């Protein structure tokens, strides 16, 4: 689409090259006509770049702001004091007014203005060499004028012609310090324009006034509310004040109001009388007043350190619509390969939409500005998906302004901004953690000076992690370039820190001497993990274990294999040995394995070769007879369970979660089974014991039990056997004979109304809830 837009613009520029003169005799001078297809080409031009007609106002305000920027720079070295013919000085602002009777919208700025030659150059010909330069810069991804402030000229380029989206006729009056005369450029967008001295004389002193005769279907732009809404959307943070003239009803007074100053020279809050105003019977009159619209100044352009925390909070609420203060903010400026200003905020609540996996939905939390002009908030990857909860603004002078979103999306500059923005965002999170640690160590600064970021008054990282930890863990899977930065931000509870989170670095710092790696267990909750038999082994060895309680952790550890040079080890995997064996122990282990080899072969045959990959002697210090672990290079039982819950198509995924049976030879039941199976491989008691222990171990490890009914029957048989009851003993006979019921009692019972027992239970439950 971007190439298509470029092709159209190139075609327009080529067709508009060269102009011809035709005669006219209406007093406006000689009209200048472009080639015959100009109207069609202009239509292609504006519609190829703009789909929303309201952007014409953004373009004109941006042009006016550039013109004011230019004159401000020029006056730093060569100040002047121009005046209108009535002796009024032009103002350094933009003003928008209306003539509803004529359906005219009027925009005026006190900027640099244009001479007759500049009007012809910038408005009269799209086919100049400037257009070629514009197209070249467009292709390079650099906007005309770039980041050089001396090029901040109020030249009307491609964007100006968006005015014909809403206007039937446009008149541009302009006065430059370089000319004694004020000129008017006028066109209906029909292939020709007029250029003539303004018959009104010097009404501007300096600057430009654009009068748009609105199309019948664009008269909504005669509404002050519509104009203000559009300004808030696109031009809220323009460097200069923007005033809109409004009609307000005020109580009439006996005193005669002073004559209003000429339009464009009024101060904020000044009153301009409607010459045709009439008081009603209740003493109310209509007056015209200038209303300042863009009261929220672009605080990101102010020096970092000169903005208070309260101002940042106020700004956040204004631009985000969130009524809460942000959890954290960071204001920074990037210079070098690309220059931009940015303020990023971390909200105090999670937007459920941030967990959406629909990549076609743009992230609208980051608003992109170019020279303080809002461009778009619909980039899908200005920040990666895992950081889509961060809100903020980015303002760059190095991006092109008047191009489509598709062209910007491919911009090299935008890719650089994205890379730096991600680094700054992760640095912001690290700062929250660092301040947390400082507070914990008693190093909190009581009354810090403004520094462009939040100064925490109390710990906040725990809340941040609980809100956005899932997002950061997703980042480990999606952003390999920043994986190390992300893992430093991770926080977990552990067997030594069940109530407070610790970082992986903290875990590493307090590892036992000689410890092989970072041990962890995953589960639905800390309470469930604490009941795991494999945790018992770590506790017995005084080894700390990380508790991972979020489903996403299982996916994360598949990507995150180590941290700070220490391997991450899942205690639920086979063959975990927390202490090294000496030579004597290794020899004994080999002999022990030979002793139990036939026993293990029998167990594997009993439970099924397809279900149990292998049977081994456990090296864990545990009181359990059997442990079921996952294969070393296989997915865990928990991950398989999570995958089954996420998609029915993965219902058979459990087959890849291979089971390893670990046998504790020191357990009395294991010793009894070994003896019984050595005598008789079909021993029923030993078989029942083996199955019950195996199924129980499966449940503890979150593997499913294949035959729950058989499991229940085996437990029943073992319980009968433990109290010397035969498995064949049937139920006892009914004991009705023990209870004597008289005929009278039976008759009385028959006469009682029948009551639904379930209804009684439900009624009791409701009553308990009420209590």
Curated annotation (Swiss-Prot):
Transmembrane helix keyword on record: no
GO molecular-function term, one example from the UniProt record: ATP binding
Domain of life of the organism encoding this protein: Eukaryota
SUPFAM superfamilies in the cross-refs: ATPase domain of HSP90 chaperone/DNA topoisomerase II/histidine kinase, HSP90 C-terminal domain, Ribosomal protein S5 domain 2-like
Signal peptide: 1-24
Motif Prevents secretion from ER, residue numbers: 768-771
Location within or outside the cell: Endoplasmic reticulum
Main location: endoplasmic reticulum
Stretches of the chain forming a coiled coil according to its record: none
The keyword Endoplasmic reticulum is assigned to this record: yes
Residue numbers marked as site, Important for ATP hydrolysis: 405
GO CC term, one of those recorded: endoplasmic reticulum
CDD domains to which the protein is assigned, alphabetical: HATPase_Hsp90-like (cd16927)
Positions of glycan attachment: 63, 306, 402
Annotated region (Disordered), positions in chain: 253-282, 727-771
Disulfide pattern: none
Function: Molecular chaperone that functions in the processing and transport of secreted proteins. Required for the synthesis of lipophosphoglycan (LPG), a cell surface glycoconjugate. Necessary for the attachment of the galactosyl residue to the mannose within the phosphoglycan repeats of the nascent LPG chain. Also required for addition of phosphoglycan to acid phosphatase. Not required for normal growth. Has ATPase activity. Binds heparin with micromolar affinity which may facilitate infection of host cells.
The protein's assembly and partners: Homotetramer.
Something else known: Prominent antigen during human and canine visceral leishmaniasis.
Listed NCBIfam families: PRK05218.1 (NF003555)
Official protein name in the record: Endoplasmin homolog
Protein's organism: Leishmania infantum
Species classification: Eukaryota, Discoba, Euglenozoa, Kinetoplastea, Metakinetoplastina
């Amino acid at each position: 689409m971007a190439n298509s837009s470029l092709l159209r613009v190139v075609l327009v520029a080529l067709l508009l090259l060269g102009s011809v003169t035709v005669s006219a005799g209406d007093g406006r001078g000689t009209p200048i006509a472009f080639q015959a297809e100009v109207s069609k080409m202009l239509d292609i031009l504006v519609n190829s770049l703009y789909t929303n007609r309201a952007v014409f106002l953004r373009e004109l305000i941006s042009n006016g702001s550039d013109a004011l920027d230019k004159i401000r720079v020029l006056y730093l070295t060569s100040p002047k004091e121009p005046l209108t013919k009535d002796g009024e000085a032009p103002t350094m602002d933009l003003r928008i007014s209306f003539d509803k009777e004529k359906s005219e919208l009027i925009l005026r700025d006190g900027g640099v203005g244009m001479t007759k030659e500049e009007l012809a150059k910038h408005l009269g010909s799209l086919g100049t060499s400037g257009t070629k330069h514009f197209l070249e810069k467009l292709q390079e991804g650099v906007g005309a004028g770039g980041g050089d402030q001396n090029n901040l000229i109020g030249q009307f380029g491609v964007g100006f012609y968006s005015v014909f989206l809403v206007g039937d006729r446009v008149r541009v009056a302009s006065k430059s310090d370089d000319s004694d005369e004020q000129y008017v450029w006028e066109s209906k967008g029909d292939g020709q324009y007029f250029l003539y001295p303004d018959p009104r004389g010097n009404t501007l002193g300096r600057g430009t006034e654009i009068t748009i005769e609105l199309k019948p279907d664009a008269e909504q732009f005669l509404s002050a509310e519509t104009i203000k809404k559009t300004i808030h959307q696109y031009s809220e943070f323009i460097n200069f004040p923007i005033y809109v003239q409004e009609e307000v009803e005020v109580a009439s007074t006996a005193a005669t109001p002073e004559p209003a100053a000429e339009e464009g020279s009024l101060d904020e809050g000044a009153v301009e009388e409607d010459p045709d105003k009439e008081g009603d019977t209740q003493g109310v009159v209509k007056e015209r007043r200038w209303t300042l619209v863009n009261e929220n100044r672009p605080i990101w352009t102010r020096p970092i350190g000169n903005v208070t925390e309260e101002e940042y909070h106020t700004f956040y609420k204004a631009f985000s619509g969130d009524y809460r203060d942000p959890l954290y903010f960071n204001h920074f400026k990037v210079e070098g390969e690309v220059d931009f200003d940015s303020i990023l905020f971390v909200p105090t609540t999670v937007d459920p939409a941030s967990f959406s996996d629909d990549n076609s939905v743009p992230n609208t939390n980051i608003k992109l500005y170019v020279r303080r002009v809002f461009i778009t908030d619909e980039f899908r990857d200005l920040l990666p998906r895992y950081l889509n909860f961060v809100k903020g603004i980015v303002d760059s002078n190095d991006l092109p302004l008047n191009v489509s979103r598709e062209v910007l999306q491919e911009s090299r500059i935008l890719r650089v901004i994205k890379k730096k923005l991600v680094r700054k965002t992760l640095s912001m999170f690290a700062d929250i953690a660092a301040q947390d640690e400082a507070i914990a160590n008693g190093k909190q600064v009581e009354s810090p000076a403004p520094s462009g970021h939040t100064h925490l008054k109390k710990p906040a990282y725990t809340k941040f992690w609980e809100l956005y930890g899932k997002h950061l863990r997703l980042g480990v899977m999606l952003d390999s370039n920043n994986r190390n930065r992300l893992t430093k931000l991770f926080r977990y509870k552990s067997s030594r820190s069940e109530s407070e989170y610790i970082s992986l670095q903290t875990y590493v710092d307090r590892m036992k001497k000689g410890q092989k790696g970072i041990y962890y267990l995953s589960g639905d909750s800390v309470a469930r993990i604490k009941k795991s038999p494999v945790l018992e082994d770590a506790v017995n060895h005084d080894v700390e274990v990380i508790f991972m309680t979020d489903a996403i952790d299982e996916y994360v550890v598949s990507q995150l294999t180590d941290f700070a040079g220490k391997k991450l080890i899942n205690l639920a995997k086979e063959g975990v040995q927390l202490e090294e064996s000496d030579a004597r122990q290794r020899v004994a282990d080999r002999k022990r394995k030979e002793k139990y080899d036939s026993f293990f072969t029998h167990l594997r045959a009993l439970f099924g070769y397809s279900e149990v990959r292998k049977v081994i002697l456990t090296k864990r210090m545990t009181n359990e007879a059997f442990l079921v672990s996952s294969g070393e290079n296989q997915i865990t039982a928990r991950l398989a369970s999570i995958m089954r819950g996420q998609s029915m198509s993965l219902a058979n995924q459990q087959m890849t979660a291979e089971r390893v049976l670990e046998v504790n030879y020191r357990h009395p039941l294991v010793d009894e089974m070994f003896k019984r199976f050595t005598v008789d491989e079909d021993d029923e008691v030993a078989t029942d014991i083996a199955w019950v222990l195996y199924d129980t171990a499966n449940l503890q490890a979150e593997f499913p039990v294949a035959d729950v009914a058989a499991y229940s029957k085996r437990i029943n048989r073992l319980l009968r056997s433990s109290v010397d009851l035969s498995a064949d003993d049937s139920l006892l006979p009914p004991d009705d004979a023990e209870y004597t019921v008289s005929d009278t009692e039976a008759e009385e019972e028959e006469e009682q109304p029948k009551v639904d027992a379930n209804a009684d239970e439900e009624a009791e439950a409701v009553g308990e809830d009420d209590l």
